[in-house]
Protein backbone atom coordinates (compact mmCIF):
# COMPACT_ATOMS: atom_id res chain seq x y z
CA UNK A 1 0.00 0.00 0.00
CA UNK A 2 1.51 3.31 -1.09
CA UNK A 3 0.58 6.74 0.26
CA UNK A 4 1.77 10.23 -0.62
CA UNK A 5 1.47 12.73 2.23
CA UNK A 6 1.65 16.53 1.97
CA UNK A 7 -0.22 17.74 5.03
CA UNK A 8 -3.67 16.31 4.32
CA UNK A 9 -5.99 16.50 7.33
CA UNK A 10 -7.21 12.92 6.90
CA UNK A 11 -3.75 11.32 6.98
CA UNK A 12 -3.81 9.99 10.53
CA UNK A 13 -7.26 8.44 10.15
CA UNK A 14 -6.27 7.12 6.72
CA UNK A 15 -3.31 5.32 8.27
CA UNK A 16 -5.48 3.90 11.05
CA UNK A 17 -7.97 2.56 8.50
CA UNK A 18 -5.14 0.90 6.57
CA UNK A 19 -3.68 -0.56 9.76
CA UNK A 20 -7.08 -2.07 10.61
CA UNK A 21 -7.34 -4.04 7.37
CA UNK A 22 -8.12 -7.74 7.80
CA UNK A 23 -7.53 -10.98 5.86
CA UNK A 24 -4.46 -9.63 4.05
CA UNK A 25 -0.76 -9.19 4.77
CA UNK A 26 0.61 -5.86 3.60
CA UNK A 27 3.27 -3.20 3.99
CA UNK A 28 2.32 0.48 4.16
CA UNK A 29 4.88 2.74 2.50
CA UNK A 30 4.53 6.51 3.00
CA UNK A 31 6.35 9.21 1.04
CA UNK A 32 6.05 12.59 2.70
CA UNK A 33 6.59 16.24 1.89
CA UNK A 34 7.73 16.03 -1.72
CA UNK A 35 6.21 17.92 -4.67
CA UNK A 36 3.49 15.88 -6.32
CA UNK A 37 5.43 14.87 -9.44
CA UNK A 38 8.57 13.89 -7.57
CA UNK A 39 6.54 12.05 -4.91
CA UNK A 40 4.75 9.92 -7.50
CA UNK A 41 7.99 9.04 -9.26
CA UNK A 42 9.56 8.08 -5.94
CA UNK A 43 6.56 5.87 -5.21
CA UNK A 44 6.80 4.09 -8.56
CA UNK A 45 10.52 3.52 -7.99
CA UNK A 46 9.94 2.19 -4.47
CA UNK A 47 7.32 -0.25 -5.73
CA UNK A 48 9.53 -1.41 -8.57
CA UNK A 49 12.26 -2.42 -6.13
CA UNK A 50 10.03 -4.66 -4.01
CA UNK A 51 7.16 -5.84 -6.21
CA UNK A 52 8.65 -9.31 -6.64
CA UNK A 53 7.76 -9.90 -2.98
CA UNK A 54 4.11 -8.85 -3.31
CA UNK A 55 0.96 -9.72 -5.25
CA UNK A 56 -0.57 -6.27 -5.83
CA UNK A 57 0.06 -2.58 -5.26
CA UNK A 58 -2.74 -0.37 -3.89
CA UNK A 59 -2.41 3.42 -3.90
CA UNK A 60 -4.32 4.99 -1.00
CA UNK A 61 -3.87 8.75 -0.98
CA UNK A 62 -3.40 10.58 2.32
CA UNK A 63 -6.80 12.27 1.90
CA UNK A 64 -8.56 8.91 1.51
CA UNK A 65 -10.02 6.85 4.37
CA UNK A 66 -10.98 3.24 3.66
CA UNK A 67 -14.49 2.71 5.00
CA UNK A 68 -14.35 -0.97 5.97
CA UNK A 69 -11.78 -3.40 7.31
CA UNK A 70 -12.16 -5.75 4.35
CA UNK A 71 -11.43 -3.12 1.67
CA UNK A 72 -7.97 -4.41 0.78
CA UNK A 73 -9.18 -8.00 0.90
CA UNK A 74 -12.02 -7.14 -1.49
CA UNK A 75 -9.51 -5.57 -3.87
CA UNK A 76 -7.17 -8.54 -3.65
CA UNK A 77 -9.98 -10.93 -4.59
CA UNK A 78 -10.57 -9.04 -7.83
CA UNK A 79 -7.05 -9.89 -8.93
CA UNK A 80 -7.78 -13.61 -8.67
CA UNK A 81 -9.15 -13.23 -12.19
CA UNK A 82 -6.04 -14.06 -14.26
CA UNK A 83 -6.32 -11.23 -16.79
CA UNK A 84 -6.92 -8.42 -14.31
CA UNK A 85 -3.96 -6.06 -14.07
CA UNK A 86 -5.70 -2.94 -12.78
CA UNK A 87 -8.66 -1.98 -10.61
CA UNK A 88 -10.27 1.41 -10.03
CA UNK A 89 -13.00 1.74 -7.39
CA UNK A 90 -14.97 4.89 -6.69
CA UNK A 91 -14.76 6.95 -3.51
CA UNK A 92 -17.26 9.31 -1.96
CA UNK A 93 -15.92 12.82 -2.44
CA UNK A 94 -16.79 15.46 0.17
CA UNK A 95 -16.56 18.46 -2.15
CA UNK A 96 -18.86 17.16 -4.89
CA UNK A 97 -20.91 14.95 -2.55
CA UNK A 98 -20.85 12.17 -5.10
CA UNK A 99 -18.85 9.14 -6.17
CA UNK A 100 -15.65 9.91 -8.03
CA UNK A 101 -12.94 7.76 -9.57
CA UNK A 102 -10.28 7.45 -6.96
CA UNK A 103 -8.72 4.32 -5.53
CA UNK A 104 -6.42 2.40 -7.87
CA UNK A 105 -4.69 -0.97 -7.58
CA UNK A 106 -2.24 -2.75 -9.87
CA UNK A 107 -0.85 -6.21 -10.42
CA UNK A 108 2.88 -6.86 -10.64
CA UNK A 109 2.54 -7.06 -14.44
CA UNK A 110 1.97 -3.33 -14.63
CA UNK A 111 4.94 -1.11 -15.39
CA UNK A 112 5.31 2.50 -14.33
CA UNK A 113 7.01 5.19 -16.38
CA UNK A 114 7.29 8.76 -15.16
CA UNK A 115 4.51 10.89 -16.64
CA UNK A 116 5.52 13.58 -19.12
CA UNK A 117 3.03 16.01 -17.55
CA UNK A 118 3.63 17.28 -14.02
CA UNK A 119 -0.08 17.98 -13.51
CA UNK A 120 -0.93 14.36 -14.31
CA UNK A 121 1.82 12.65 -12.34
CA UNK A 122 -0.39 9.63 -11.65
CA UNK A 123 -0.85 8.86 -15.35
CA UNK A 124 2.13 6.53 -15.35
CA UNK A 125 0.87 2.92 -15.49
CA UNK A 126 1.21 0.80 -18.61
CA UNK A 127 1.45 -2.83 -19.78
CA UNK A 128 -2.13 -3.57 -18.74
CA UNK A 129 -4.20 -6.51 -19.90
CA UNK A 130 -7.58 -5.92 -18.25
CA UNK A 131 -8.57 -2.97 -16.04
CA UNK A 132 -11.89 -3.30 -14.25
CA UNK A 133 -13.77 -0.24 -13.04
CA UNK A 134 -17.15 1.47 -13.13
CA UNK A 135 -20.12 -0.89 -13.14
CA UNK A 136 -17.89 -3.95 -12.89
CA UNK A 137 -16.88 -2.95 -9.36
CA UNK A 138 -19.89 -0.84 -8.38
CA UNK A 139 -20.76 -3.37 -5.67
CA UNK A 140 -17.63 -2.25 -3.81
CA UNK A 141 -18.28 1.49 -4.11
CA UNK A 142 -17.73 3.62 -2.27
CA UNK A 143 -14.66 1.91 -0.90
CA UNK A 144 -13.71 4.98 1.10
CA UNK A 145 -14.12 8.68 1.75
CA UNK A 146 -12.19 11.32 -0.14
CA UNK A 147 -11.33 14.59 1.65
CA UNK A 148 -13.62 13.89 4.58
CA UNK A 149 -12.20 16.67 6.81
CA UNK A 150 -10.45 19.11 4.46
CA UNK A 151 -8.53 22.05 5.88
CA UNK A 152 -8.59 25.40 4.04
CA UNK A 153 -5.16 24.90 2.46
CA UNK A 154 -6.09 21.42 1.29
CA UNK A 155 -9.45 22.58 -0.08
CA UNK A 156 -7.82 25.44 -1.99
CA UNK A 157 -5.36 22.96 -3.49
CA UNK A 158 -8.21 20.62 -4.46
CA UNK A 159 -10.09 23.34 -6.33
CA UNK A 160 -7.01 24.69 -8.05
CA UNK A 161 -5.98 21.27 -9.35
CA UNK A 162 -9.47 20.28 -10.47
CA UNK A 163 -9.79 23.49 -12.46
CA UNK A 164 -6.30 23.18 -13.95
CA UNK A 165 -7.23 19.67 -15.07
CA UNK A 166 -10.40 21.14 -16.63
CA UNK A 167 -12.66 18.92 -14.54
CA UNK A 168 -15.53 21.34 -14.95
CA UNK A 169 -18.22 18.87 -13.86
CA UNK A 170 -16.54 18.42 -10.47
CA UNK A 171 -16.11 22.18 -10.03
CA UNK A 172 -19.74 22.78 -11.00
CA UNK A 173 -20.96 20.13 -8.58
CA UNK A 174 -18.81 21.61 -5.79
CA UNK A 175 -20.31 25.03 -6.52
CA UNK A 176 -23.84 23.60 -6.32
CA UNK A 177 -23.07 21.99 -2.97
CA UNK A 178 -21.58 25.23 -1.63
CA UNK A 179 -24.63 27.24 -2.70
CA UNK A 180 -26.71 24.70 -0.76
CA UNK A 181 -24.59 24.30 2.40
CA UNK A 182 -22.37 27.43 2.50
CA UNK A 183 -19.53 25.50 4.15
CA UNK A 184 -16.03 26.85 4.54
CA UNK A 185 -14.22 23.93 2.90
CA UNK A 186 -16.13 24.15 -0.38
CA UNK A 187 -15.72 27.93 -0.37
CA UNK A 188 -11.96 27.43 -0.27
CA UNK A 189 -12.13 24.83 -3.03
CA UNK A 190 -14.02 27.29 -5.22
CA UNK A 191 -11.48 29.98 -4.34
CA UNK A 192 -8.76 27.73 -5.72
CA UNK A 193 -10.80 26.90 -8.81
CA UNK A 194 -11.48 30.53 -9.69
CA UNK A 195 -7.78 31.34 -9.30
CA UNK A 196 -6.66 28.62 -11.72
CA UNK A 197 -4.95 29.83 -14.87
CA UNK A 198 -2.03 29.02 -17.13
CA UNK A 199 0.50 30.62 -14.76
CA UNK A 200 -0.31 27.85 -12.25
CA UNK A 201 0.25 24.95 -14.62
CA UNK A 202 3.55 24.17 -12.85
CA UNK A 203 2.87 26.03 -9.59
CA UNK A 204 0.21 23.92 -7.89
CA UNK A 205 2.24 22.18 -5.17
CA UNK A 206 1.84 23.16 -1.54
CA UNK A 207 5.48 24.21 -1.48
CA UNK A 208 5.35 26.39 -4.61
CA UNK A 209 5.87 30.09 -4.01
CA UNK A 210 3.00 31.21 -6.23
CA UNK A 211 0.60 28.79 -4.54
CA UNK A 212 1.59 30.05 -1.10
CA UNK A 213 1.31 33.72 -2.05
CA UNK A 214 -2.09 33.27 -3.69
CA UNK A 215 -3.47 31.41 -0.67
CA UNK A 216 -2.16 34.07 1.72
CA UNK A 217 -3.63 36.85 -0.39
CA UNK A 218 -7.06 35.24 -0.30
CA UNK A 219 -6.85 34.65 3.45
CA UNK A 220 -6.53 38.42 3.81
CA UNK A 221 -9.18 39.26 1.22
CA UNK A 222 -12.31 40.56 2.97
CA UNK A 223 -14.31 40.19 -0.26
CA UNK A 224 -13.35 36.57 -0.93
CA UNK A 225 -16.78 35.11 -0.20
CA UNK A 226 -18.45 37.66 -2.46
CA UNK A 227 -16.12 36.56 -5.26
CA UNK A 228 -16.83 32.91 -4.46
CA UNK A 229 -20.58 33.49 -4.65
CA UNK A 230 -20.27 35.23 -8.02
CA UNK A 231 -18.07 32.42 -9.31
CA UNK A 232 -20.40 29.70 -7.99
CA UNK A 233 -23.41 31.32 -9.63
CA UNK A 234 -21.50 31.67 -12.89
CA UNK A 235 -20.36 28.04 -13.14
CA UNK A 236 -23.78 26.66 -12.19
CA UNK A 237 -25.83 28.90 -14.48
Task: Report residues per predicted region.
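Short beta-strand-to-loop element that shapes/binds the nucleotide-sugar donor at the catalytic cleft/hinge
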Residues: 86-102
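Short, acidic, metal-binding catalytic loop of nucleotide-sugar glycosyltransferases
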Residues: 13-25
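C-terminal catalytic/acceptor-binding lobe
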Residues: 137-237
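Active-site nucleotide-sugar/metal-binding loop of Leloir-type enzymes
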Residues: 41-56
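A short, glycine-/small-residue-rich helix N-cap motif at loop->alpha-helix starts
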Residues: 34-41
